[in-house]
Amino acid sequence: MDMVSLKFIGIGLMAIGMYGAALGVSNIFSSLLSSIARNPSAAENLQRMALIGAGLAEAMGLFSFVIAMLLIFS
């Protein structure tokens, strides 16, 4: 295989990181909704923690996207 083929295989594998971020965010918010349904008085605190967690999960997806773009254009 030449280097261009290996580069595109690496870019395809970076999609796993973006898939993982999407799964993480969906898991965070489904847990948030079930937790608020059980204990509505803690909704404000739970929502704050869920948004921080979702931001961190999205950051992993964005890092993976940036690395994929660097691989494409380098």
From Swiss-Prot:
GO cellular component: plasma membrane; proton-transporting ATP synthase complex; proton-transporting two-sector ATPase complex, proton-transporting domain
Pfam families (alphabetical): ATP-synt_C
GO MF term set: lipid binding; proton-transporting ATP synthase activity, rotational mechanism
Keywords linked to the UniProt accession: ATP synthesis, Cell inner membrane, Cell membrane, CF(0), Hydrogen ion transport, Ion transport, Lipid-binding, Membrane, Transmembrane, Transmembrane helix, Transport
Site entry: Reversibly protonated during proton transport: E58
Source organism, top-level taxon: Bacteria
Topology term for the membrane: Multi-pass membrane protein
Classification via InterPro entries: ATP_synth_F0_csu, ATP_synth_F0_csu_DDCD_BS, ATP_synth_F0_csu_sf, ATPase_proteolipid_c-like_dom, F/V-ATP_Csub_sf
The keyword Transmembrane helix belongs to this UniProt entry's keyword annotation: yes
Membrane-spanning parts: 8-28, 52-72
Compartment(s) where it occurs, according to its Swiss-Prot or TrEMBL record: Cell inner membrane
Subunit-level organization: F-type ATPases have 2 components, F(1) - the catalytic core - and F(0) - the membrane proton channel. F(1) has five subunits: alpha(3), beta(3), gamma(1), delta(1), epsilon(1). F(0) has three main subunits: a(1), b(2) and c(10-14). The alpha and beta chains form an alternating ring which encloses part of the gamma chain. F(1) is attached to F(0) by a central stalk formed by the gamma and epsilon chains, while a peripheral stalk is formed by the delta and b chains.
Family as reported in the entry's similarity comment: Belongs to the ATPase C chain family.
Function: F(1)F(0) ATP synthase produces ATP from ADP in the presence of a proton or sodium gradient. F-type ATPases consist of two structural domains, F(1) containing the extramembraneous catalytic core and F(0) containing the membrane proton channel, linked together by a central stalk and a peripheral stalk. During catalysis, ATP synthesis in the catalytic domain of F(1) is coupled via a rotary mechanism of the central stalk subunits to proton translocation.
Protein name according to UniProt: ATP synthase subunit c
Organism: Rickettsia felis (strain ATCC VR-1525 / URRWXCal2) (Rickettsia azadi)
Name of the coding gene: atpE
